[in-house]
């Protein structure tokens, strides 16, 4: 026996009045969204209760009907949250499933709930409420990760490590400075979600199908009841707008990119070739054949999963790019992308917060790597400019020549003798060696935003104050 719903049943009594026959079973499968939009149940019920209260306040519903609707919707909410609600695919979506159950519970008044409302504005408000909640969750998750990076920055404000360009040693920096770079990225991520939330905080409920309604509704009342700043100002835009979802996905994609970048660094840094960090057993796995292995699987999986967030953004941009005003059924494809991106991002933020909180920096390996690869060559060039008044380009050439000599000898710059240096430029003095140490190098980078330990401590204190964590 087929599990497909019977097209001749009363499955589509919500809209089937002008149809002589029900939809094909395959059409029902294509059309149904209850498999994923049931996640909107709380927002749908919240919106419906606000709508019913407004209708009663405006004299469109009796207070008795509005009370029955409100209590019935709370019963539906309890049933769904208890896990026993019978979602029915033939009812297509969360809106019809809730309304059908409400009718079973309270009878005729349930049919009055949809007065002055369409599924077009209903889903628009449900989805906005859900995405708004996810913005709040993302902001909270980002702040937790910022605090984890700040703790690492404070602990390692003066731990020297190599800074890289092209994944090659460039100049010495501090561990704390590197950690604060991610705090800056995450702060921008946070601000993007804050901005997106502010822009989406307008209520589309009451726009109806696309043209508004002739009923004397109070859209400001429903907007206030649902925590929106104001109602949307154009009914056509209200039901066709998915900018709020696109902005959420855009902010999520950029944040995911930042998580992926640090995940990549963790994979590299935890390798035997680098040994910069030790990852906790909680975030690593072993090998089924190689007993010695400790694989950074959490970082690798996070690096891969973050690509799904970018993919979700591209997918929804692609759905929306060719749609005329106002609503098209294409827009039903908006939710799965947003749901998956939100789930993936929140998982990534939680995992990264745990990894950053648990990771242990190997100070010896960091310092040894910082001192290799001619990392203080720029300090030497700066000394030549500052002490010998050489033009920087000349100083750059002199330093490059000295690097080549050291490389030929198989040593680093501090291992060259003063006499060898003076063969390249006779003005070089003994005090040049003071600038060739990595500790002196990082201490000298005192320009605003530089890597000097005092700068790192000041920036960490600033961020703690901004996050409300200052002592």
Swiss-Prot record:
* Catalytic reaction annotation: 2-(N(omega)-L-arginino)succinate = fumarate + L-arginine
Q: What does the UniProt entry say about where the protein is found?
A: Cytoplasm
Q: Which UniProt keywords apply?
A: Amino-acid biosynthesis, Arginine biosynthesis, Cytoplasm, Lyase
Q: What class of enzyme is it?
A: lyase
The UniProt entry, under PROSITE patterns, shows: FUMARATE_LYASES (PS00163)
In terms of CDD domains, this protein maps to: Argininosuccinate_lyase
EC numbers: 4.3.2.1
| InterPro entries for this protein | Arg_succ_lyase_C, Argininosuccinate_lyase, Fumarase/histidase_N, Fumarate_lyase_CS, Fumarate_lyase_fam, Fumarate_lyase_N, L-Aspartase-like
Cite a single GO MF annotation.
Answer: argininosuccinate lyase activity
List the GO biological process terms.
arginine biosynthetic process via ornithine; L-arginine biosynthetic process
Fetch the NCBIfam families from UniProt. argH
Task: Give the protein family.
Answer: Belongs to the lyase 1 family. Argininosuccinate lyase subfamily.
Q: Which PANTHER family is this protein grouped with?
A: ARGININOSUCCINATE LYASE
- The protein's name is Argininosuccinate lyase
Q: Which organism is it from?
A: Cereibacter sphaeroides (strain ATCC 17023 / DSM 158 / JCM 6121 / CCUG 31486 / LMG 2827 / NBRC 12203 / NCIMB 8253 / ATH 2.4.1.) (Rhodobacter sphaeroides)
User: Its gene?
Assistant: argH
């Amino acid at each position: 026996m087929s599990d497909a719903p019977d097209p001749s049943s009363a499955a589509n009594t919500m809209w089937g009045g002008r149809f002589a026959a029900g939809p094909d079973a395959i059409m029902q499968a294509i059309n149904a969204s209850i498999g994923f939009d049931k996640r909107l149940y709380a927002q749908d019920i919240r919106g419906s209760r606000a709508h019913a209260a407004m209708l009663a306040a405006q004299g469109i519903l009796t207070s008795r009907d509005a009370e029955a609707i409100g209590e019935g919707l709370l019963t539906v909410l309890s049933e769904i949250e208890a896990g026993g609600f019978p979602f029915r695919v033939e009812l297509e979506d969360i809106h019809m499933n809730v309304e059908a159950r409400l009718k079973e519970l309270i009878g005729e008044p349930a049919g009055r709930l949809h007065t002055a409302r369409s599924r077009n504005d209903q889903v628009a408000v449900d989805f906005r409420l859900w995405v708004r909640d996810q913005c709040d969750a993302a902001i909270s998750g980002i702040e937790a990760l910022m605090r984890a990076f700040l703790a690492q920055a404070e602990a390692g404000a003066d731990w020297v490590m190599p800074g890289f360009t092209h994944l090659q040693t460039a100049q010495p920096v501090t561990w704390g400075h590197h950690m604060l770079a991610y705090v800056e990225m995450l702060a921008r991520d946070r601000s993007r979600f804050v901005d997106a939330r502010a822009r989406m905080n307008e209520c589309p409920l009451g726009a109806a199908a696309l043209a508004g309604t002739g009923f004397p509704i109070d859209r400001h009342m429903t907007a206030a009841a649902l925590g929106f700043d104001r109602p949307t100002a154009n009914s056509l835009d209200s039901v066709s707008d998915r900018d709020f979802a696109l902005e959420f996905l855009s902010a999520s994609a950029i944040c995911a990119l930042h998580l992926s970048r640090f995940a990549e660094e963790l994979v590299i840094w935890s390798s035997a070739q680098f040994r910069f960090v030790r990852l906790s057993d909680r975030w690593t796995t072993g090998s089924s054949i190689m007993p010695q292995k400790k694989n950074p699987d959490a970082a690798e999986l996070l690096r891969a999963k973050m690509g799904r967030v970018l993919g979700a953004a591209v997918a929804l941009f692609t759905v929306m790019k060719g749609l005329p005003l106002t609503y098209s059924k294409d827009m039903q494809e908006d939710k799965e992308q947003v749901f998956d991106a939100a789930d993936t991002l929140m998982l990534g933020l939680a995992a990264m917060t745990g990894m950053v909180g648990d990771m242990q920096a190997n100070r010896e390996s960091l310092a040894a790597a910082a001192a290799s690869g001619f990392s203080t060559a720029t300090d030497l060039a700066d000394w030549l400019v500052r002490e010998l008044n050489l033009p920087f380009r000349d100083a750059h050439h002199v330093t490059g020549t000295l690097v080549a000599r050291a490389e030929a000898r198989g040593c680093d710059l501090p291992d060259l003798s003063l006499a060898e240096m003076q063969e390249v430029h006779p003005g070089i003095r003994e005090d040049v060696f003071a600038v060739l140490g990595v500790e002196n190098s990082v201490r000298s980078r005192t320009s605003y935003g530089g890597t000097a330990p005092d700068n790192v401590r000041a920036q960490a204190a600033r961020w703690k104050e901004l996050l409300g964590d200052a002592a």
